[in-house]
């Protein structure tokens, strides 16, 4: 049996070229002012939809989604603070982080002491602009560098936020790639942050390129890519797609996977789901500095997929963990913070995880009484791989453990050998009549 698709190998080739393309796509998306609703997320989905087939869904304001309701739609055109000289001291056109995301419209004049309660800064990083939101409480405000605050004169200011908060809809995008099985692999990433590169243009770009990589291939599983607003988007999708959710067999939430930090994988609520084991195995061999974290109900949209009513096998793949790096939710999470090499490596890791899941099967040894004589079949020598001894060991491990009950991932975990070399061994032994696949039919 030939490997279905060498995704990991494909992503590894021309890593520099692939990384440059990923970074360029992030650069194109970076200027857009996104939020959990509105034209910013629509524009973002439109750009993703030029690269992969994307179905757009609009869910009206007020729609009940479990214990929540779809919020009003927010759009912004301009915002500024200017002094009596009509010069803007804070300008939304220079950074869309300057406005408290979801601010209600305001246009008034006020003295500095009245304005200050509406200003947000990071004193410990005085040149950085914070990212703040007020999704579910109507308010307005500006986020500015602390040095900007210190430079404000005690005078009257004109304050303008040219925005709308009114009935509309919540927007999300889906890319569905059918496989032989109706069982699904889910890839989810939040698309609601404005000009923040690692969180989460990294996830959006890698997911888009991953869908391109999978598109047109002969797939075992069907794949569903979700580009959604954080929290409320996942809740909305789950409330509208309970039957679809029941078909999810593996899943990854992708976030903050473009910085230079080590990989972190947060396990699903199930703790030992196949995707948890697959991610841990790939990271062990591809990124030895990676850490596997236990499940926690704090984080990204894995919180919703892993809620007890669904309890889906969905983990979260990151590099630096949210909230642990100073650039998190600040203007320092910019395109310079995003590494082209890291993006390419993240794409390769994701592809390798899915390659493992696609090829993880159980086999039956057709010559189970003592070892079959490999030499007379030409199987007791290397086929030209980088580790001849490992190739022989892989064949012996696969033969010994192929009792119809152990999968290749089981064998990989027990032997310490990379999954890929065991999969190659299983294919070779199958071609020589020594193994038979025993997996039940899919879908």
Label for each model-derived stretch:
Residues 1-443:
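N-terminal hydrophobic/helix-forming segments and targeting peptides
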């Amino acid at each position: 049996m030939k490997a279905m698709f060498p995704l990991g190998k494909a992503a590894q080739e021309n890593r520099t070229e692939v990384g440059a393309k990923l970074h360029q796509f992030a650069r194109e998306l970076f200027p857009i002012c996104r939020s959990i609703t509105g034209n910013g997320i629509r524009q973002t989905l439109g750009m993703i939809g030029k690269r992969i087939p994307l179905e757009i869904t609009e869910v009206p304001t007020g729609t009940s989604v479990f214990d929540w309701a779809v919020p009003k739609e927010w759009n912004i055109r301009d915002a500024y603070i200017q002094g009596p000289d009509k010069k803007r001291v804070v300008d939304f056109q220079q950074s869309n982080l300057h406005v408290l995301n979801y601010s209600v419209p305001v246009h008034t004049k006020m003295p500095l002491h009245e304005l200050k309660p509406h200003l947000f800064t990071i004193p410990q990083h005085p040149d950085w602009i914070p990212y703040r939101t007020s999704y579910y409480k109507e308010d307005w405000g500006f986020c500015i560098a602390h040095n900007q605050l210190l430079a404000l004169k005690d005078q009257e200011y004109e304050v303008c936020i040219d925005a709308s908060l009114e009935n509309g809809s919540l927007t999300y995008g889906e890319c569905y790639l059918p496989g032989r099985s109706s069982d699904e692999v889910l890839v989810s990433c939040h698309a609601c942050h404005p000009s923040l590169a690692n969180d989460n243009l990294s996830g959006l770009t890698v997911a888009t390129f991953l869908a391109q990589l999978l598109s047109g291939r002969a797939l075992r599983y069907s794949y569903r890519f979700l580009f959604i607003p954080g929290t409320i988007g996942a809740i909305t999708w789950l409330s509208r797609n309970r039957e679809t959710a029941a078909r999810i067999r593996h899943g990854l939430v992708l976030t903050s996977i473009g910085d230079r930090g080590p990989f972190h994988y947060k396990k699903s609520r199930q703790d030992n789901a196949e995707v948890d084991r697959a991610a841990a195995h790939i990271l062990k061999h591809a990124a030895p500095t990676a850490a596997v974290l236990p499940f926690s109900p704090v984080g990204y949209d894995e919180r919703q997929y892993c809620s007890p009513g669904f309890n889906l096998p969905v983990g979260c793949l990151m590099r630096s963990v949210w909230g642990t790096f100073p650039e998190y939710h600040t203007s320092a999470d910019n395109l310079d913070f995003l590494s082209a090499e890291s993006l390419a490596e993240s794409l390769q890791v994701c592809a390798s995880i899915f390659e493992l899941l696609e090829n993880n099967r159980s086999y039956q040894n057709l010559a189970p009484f003592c070892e079959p004589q490999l030499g007379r079949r030409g199987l007791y020598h290397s086929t030209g791989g980088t580790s001849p001894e490992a190739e022989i060991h892989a064949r012996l491990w696969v033969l010994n453990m192929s009792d119809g009950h152990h999968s290749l991932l089981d064998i990989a975990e027990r032997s310490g050998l990379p999954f890929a070399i065991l999969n190659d061994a299983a294919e070779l032994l199958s071609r020589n009549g020594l193994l038979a696949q025993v997996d039940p039919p899919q879908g």
